[in-house]
A protein has these predicted regions:
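Catalytic cores and adjacent flexible loops of soluble metabolic enzymes
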Residues: 1-306
Length: 306
């Protein structure tokens, strides 16, 4: 489909929360209304014992595979599997001890910033750097599932890059590719999307996941958007060269005999562009021609006396 990497989530329901019926642990409203936290995470978890096979397969097909650990035991598992990078989820953005533990691996770290204010984002960055992280990317993120596109606030991307001096990407939970394409134009260097093979196969994140066709489109559209930026410049582009001849120029539109004076009835500014530039029309009027000229002849100074 064109993706550069696959990111998993490494947790179990027991490492995320406790199995409790207390109202604090029950979701009210939204996509997962009525779920207990424990039951939702139980449904969505990727068993630890599956990870080795998935990483082995990713290496076999030569695609980068990494994961989001949600506690220290997940980090330890991923270290044993020699994961090349890590991600911190938005909901763990304030878990500074976990961020420090992940950063201490000295591996590249991607951190989502959903729900975090700027002071919290600064704390995340300081914690990661203080624990040894050298390669850091922050993801602008709206932690709503799905996220409303009109609350994307993508102008945060260049602002965050300017303030913090790190690469910025987008963790996109909207249901279309629009926000991701715009983000790439604004300088996002990484786009994250939830992925599902078939939305008819319902899952915890199916409502805001993209399918293979949509992922292929996303990869092409974001790459094209980035390539379209080019650089600021006013020189003619190679792709335009072939069409120069279809510009307007000055042509004889009436037969004229050698020695006659050109009048405005003899010439017009028309396409194609093989004649003198349109701005020279007034210069031609009142001049004499030095040979017989038929209608449809491009003007040139070689045809003019003096």
């Amino acid at each position: 489909c064109g993706a550069d990497a696959v990111k998993l989530q490494t947790y179990t329901a027991d490492t995320m929360t406790i199995d409790s019926d207390h109202k604090d642990f029950c979701i009210q409203g939204g996509l997962w209304d009525g779920y207990k936290l424990y039951d939702l995470y139980k449904e969505a978890e990727t068993p630890f014992e599956w990870h080795k096979a998935m990483f082995d397969h990713a290496r076999k097909i030569d695609i980068t595979c990494f994961s989001t650990p949600f506690d220290e035991t997940a980090v330890d598992l991923l270290e044993d599997l020699n994961v090349p990078a890590y991600k911190v989820a938005s909901f763990e953005a304030t878990d500074l001890p976990l961020i420090a533990y992940i950063a201490s691996t000295k591996k590249p770290l991607i951190m989502s910033t959903g729900m975090a204010n700027f002071e919290e984002i600064e704390e995340m960055v300081e914690t990661a750097r203080g624990a040894g992280c050298k390669d850091l990317i922050l993801l602008h993120c709206i932690s709503s599932y799905p996220a409303p596109v009109d609350q994307s606030n993508l102008l945060t991307i260049p602002d965050m890059r300017k303030r913090l001096g790190v690469q910025i990407g987008l963790s996109d939970h909207t249901v279309t590719n629009t926000a991701s394409v715009v983000a790439s134009v604004l300088g996002a260097t990484l786009i994250e999307k939830h992925f599902i093979l078939d939305r008819n196969e319902k899952g915890p994140d199916s409502e805001f996941s993209i399918n293979p066709v949509e992922l292929t489109s996303l990869c092409k559209e974001t790459k094209d958007a980035w390539l379209s930026l080019g650089c600021a410049g006013y020189e003619r582009k190679p792709a335009e060269e072939a069409n120069i001849k279809f510009r307007r120029s000055v042509y004889f539109v009436k037969d004229i005999s050698a020695g006659d004076v050109i009048t405005k009835e003899h010439v017009r500014r028309i396409r194609p562009g093989y004649g003198l530039p349109p701005k020279m029309e007034k210069e031609l009027i009142g001049r004499k021609v030095n040979k017989n000229i038929v209608v449809g002849t491009a003007t040139s100074w070689e045809l003019i006396d003096g």
